[in-house]
Design a protein with these regions (language model features):
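Gly/Pro-rich turn-and-neighbor structural signature
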Residues: 183-187
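Small-polar-interrupted transmembrane alpha-helices in polytopic inner-membrane proteins
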Residues: 190-209
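Glycan-association/targeting regions that enable binding to alpha-glucans and other polysaccharides
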Residues: 2-182, 194, 198, 247, ...
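Generic detector of multi-pass transmembrane helix bundles and their immediately adjacent loops
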Residues: 229-300
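Non-cytosolic membrane-interface motifs at loop->transmembrane helix junctions
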Residues: 152-158, 213-226
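Loop-to-transmembrane-helix entry motif
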Residues: 194, 225-231
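Juxtamembrane "helix-exit" motif on the non-cytosolic side of transmembrane helices
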Residues: 204-215, 274-275
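Interfacial non-cytosolic loop connecting adjacent transmembrane helices
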Residues: 210-221, 284-292
Length: 300
């Protein structure tokens, strides 16, 4: 197979890097660890907020710190954090926010009680201005925070790095199959190796540390993150098994399978992270069941 021109190979790497970075940004923006952001207005002035949506469980944490910019005592007479356990009929707990000063910035601060792994709370903040006006933050709906057990960095960071490395190489393999098939096989096999290590080996370890189970996708549960990892990995297994290690007489089929695997990878990363992920069923906890045995998946 003829070697592709340098300019074309370089261009394909640039496009692959762009697609990988787009996947990183999208996964972070749609994932459960991304803070809820917005603005609220008091006395004609706008304030940007960033509300926490992920924190450590009761194993290593007492409370999740909720922080809001403080417009000042002359503008805000009261601010209340309102929360309860998700998917329960619990009455909402109301907690007055306290005023703090952090590095010269006035803040309104509250604390959400830490939950067992996969436990979730829903909350919002009610601000009463000095002129008696009520401001709800966010203006509609609730912010949902999920708690998880601590994941060691030696497991988490290699998993994250390996997954996005696999996306980079997978995108390059798919683009190469379309426009410059020279070394297509090398990139396809490297992508499969990266997903095997980062997704199918380290991924379950991250899940085990965070929520107590190695695998919560098919056939054991409805975790979309595990399921999309499985589909993505299998698509590359099929592609690599078909293309082998050397060029064949049916290169059109080989190239088509690598392109299909690349498309499957891109589609998988368009699915928001942690959809249908681990969630504590409080109805079981209230029946006396150990929280570690009361975790469900597949809920929306």
């Amino acid at each position: 197979m003829n070697k592709s021109p340098l300019w074309l190979r370089s261009l394909l790497w640039v496009v692959a890097v762009f697609l990988m970075l787009a996947a990183v940004v999208y996964q972070r923006a749609t994932g459960p660890t991304h803070p809820a952001r917005g603005d609220f207005e008091v006395a004609g002035q706008s304030y940007a907020y960033k509300l926490i949506r992920s924190d450590w469980s009761i194993k290593t944490n007492e409370a999740a710190r909720v922080v809001l910019p403080d417009p000042g005592g002359d503008k805000v007479s009261d601010a209340v954090l309102v929360f309860r356990r998700l998917r329960t009929d619990d009455p909402f707990t109301r907690q007055t926010l306290r005023r703090e000063n952090h590095q010269g910035k006035p803040l309104l601060v509250g604390a959400l009680p830490a939950q067992p792994a996969a436990g979730k709370l829903e909350y919002h903040i009610e601000v009463t201005t000095s002129d008696g006006r009520s401001v709800r933050i966010p203006s509609q709906g609730e912010v949902i925070i999920r708690f998880k057990d601590h994941v060691p960095g030696w497991v988490l960071w290699p998993h994250v790095v390996m997954m996005f490395f696999s996306v980079l190489i997978g995108m390059r393999a798919g683009l190469g199959a379309l426009f410059a098939p020279w070394r297509m096989r090398l990139w396809a096999w490297i992508a499969l190796a990266g997903m095997t290590l980062g997704g199918m080996c380290l991924g379950p370890l991250v899940q085990k540390y965070a929520f107590g189970a190695y695998w919560t996708g098919f056939p054991f549960g409805g975790d979309w993150t595990d399921n999309k990892m499985l589909v993505m990995w299998l698509s590359w297994v099929v592609a690599c098994a078909a293309i082998g290690l050397r060029p064949s007489k049916r290169e059109v089929i080989s190239r088509a399978l690598v392109v299909a695997a690349g498309i499957a990878m891109m589609v998988a990363f368009l699915i928001p992270h942690s959809m249908g992920g681990s969630e504590l069923d409080y109805s079981k906890v209230d029946q006396g069941i150990d929280p570690a045995r009361a975790i469900e998946t597949g809920r929306q």
